[in-house]
Amino acid sequence: MSSESLTVIVGLGKTGLSCAQFLAAKNRPFAVMDSREEPPEWENFIKTYPRVELIRGQFSEKLLNEAQEIILSPGVSLQEPLIAKQAAQGKSIIGDIELFARNVNKPIIAITGSNGKTTVTTVVGLMMKAAGRNVSVCGNIGEPVLEQITPEPDYYVLELSSFQLETTFSLRSQAATILNISEDHMNRYATLQDYLRAKQRIYTDCFIPIVNADEPEIWRHLPFNKKPLSFGLNNAADFSLAEHNQKTSIAYQGKILMPIQELKLNARHHLQNALAALALGTAAKIPIENMLHVLRDFSGIRHRCQWVRKYKEIDYYNDSKGTNVGATRAAIESLGQAAKGQLILIAGGQGKGADFSPLKDVVKRYVKQVILIGEDAPLLEKTLKEITVIKHADSMNEAVKRSTQAAKAGDIVLLSPACASFDMFTNYEHRGDVFTETVEAL
């Protein structure tokens, strides 16, 4: 195998396998390594590519040295010592999004942010479909991007994580946005500024930047080539809220589009998502009627502030996708404002090095009891114990029982962990499913 053209894929999950399939189809020589003994796709890989070198259980410096280019899966940090060493030597280190960007010519809408990106990506995809466009919604949501290159759609709508953006250099989007920023993945970034810098890469070579007017610190120092299109709940913006006939309505540059009561989801974070989707859709020239029709019909995504059921006049919400402090804060604030009573919060898991103190004010205002689960329960307790009643549970079943005992008519039980799930569950979907099944069995 000629090292002059050898590509080494680091990480063999769904993304790594999609990179292998892409390179194999192009007849490009490659090898794969994963520090795990049994990475998720290794059995599929050896069946399909029995003659391709696969190193499991460690990273091979020798193989990395032989590579002309390294494709890094988003789960592997650029700070990984052997990877950092290759970067310092000037080796090309890319991700699957970069490989994708080099090989597509169709317009791209690109979306990132700490919270709401899956919802906004989904909604923009639905708006495209409503306008009769053939669209592929992919990236950090659903299928890996490299599986969507053929057959080619009219449009791509990509959800992108900070990890994916770090290894992307050639993305040229028709429109791109950072929805918001709050602490997340601080186990991978030294500072919040480093995390923001990774996110800001989405605006490189973007034709129409879409910006959050309520968080100008994200974008105000960036050198845009074109005037941004803005959305915001509080500050002046192209897409905003306005009072009209004693109703709060969505407006575009002062023109009333629709009252928010026509939306099935109209809590604050849902409204921010709707405004962002309208701005992105406008940049993609989707007719306004199609966009408003989609917003009226949209009833949310599983595990994202999803209403589960009412039991003894208590409402249960599954926000298992609340894997960081900002997401949980937004969920507490939105549901707290809407609740007749108070909130009982189920939280905890793997905190990823986050600072939990931004939860204090909303917990104090809306939450009468917190049931803690998972390995970082002690850190959450340390932050919140002066503010509200803290209880512990060893399982989701016990957490749901304890929260039901603490709740009374008009209260809301909210699962929004502010943490990753891997200490107790396969992923956040599994955690949300266990919560939902437990609630439905009450």
From Swiss-Prot:
UniProtKB keywords: ATP-binding, Cell cycle, Cell division, Cell shape, Cell wall biogenesis/degradation, Cytoplasm, Ligase, Nucleotide-binding, Peptidoglycan synthesis
Enzymatic reactions: UDP-N-acetyl-alpha-D-muramoyl-L-alanine + D-glutamate + ATP = UDP-N-acetyl-alpha-D-muramoyl-L-alanyl-D-glutamate + ADP + phosphate + H(+)
Record SUPFAM superfamilies: MurCD N-terminal domain, MurD-like peptide ligases, catalytic domain, MurD-like peptide ligases, peptide-binding domain
GO annotation terms (biological process): cell division; cell wall organization; peptidoglycan biosynthetic process; regulation of cell shape
InterPro entries given in the database record: Mur-like_cat_sf (IPR036565), Mur_ligase_C (IPR004101), Mur_ligase_C_dom_sf (IPR036615), Mur_ligase_cen (IPR013221), MurD (IPR005762)
Recorded GO CC terms: cytoplasm
Pathway per the UniProt entry: Cell wall biogenesis; peptidoglycan biosynthesis
Pfam families for this protein: Mur_ligase_C (PF02875), Mur_ligase_M (PF08245), MurD-like_N (PF21799)
One GO MF term attached to the UniProt entry: UDP-N-acetylmuramoylalanine-D-glutamate ligase activity
Domain of life per record: Bacteria
Binding locations of ATP: G113, S114, N115, G116, K117, T118, T119
Claim: Nucleotide-binding is one of the keywords in the record: yes
Annotated compartments: Cytoplasm
E.C. code: 6.3.2.9
Protein family according to the UniProt entry: Belongs to the MurCDEF family.
NCBIfam families xrefs: murD
Record function comment: Cell wall formation. Catalyzes the addition of glutamate to the nucleotide precursor UDP-N-acetylmuramoyl-L-alanine (UMA).
Name this protein carries in UniProt: UDP-N-acetylmuramoylalanine--D-glutamate ligase
Organism: Coxiella burnetii (strain Dugway 5J108-111)
Lineage of the species this protein comes from: Bacteria, Pseudomonadati, Pseudomonadota, Gammaproteobacteria, Legionellales
Gene name of this polypeptide: murD
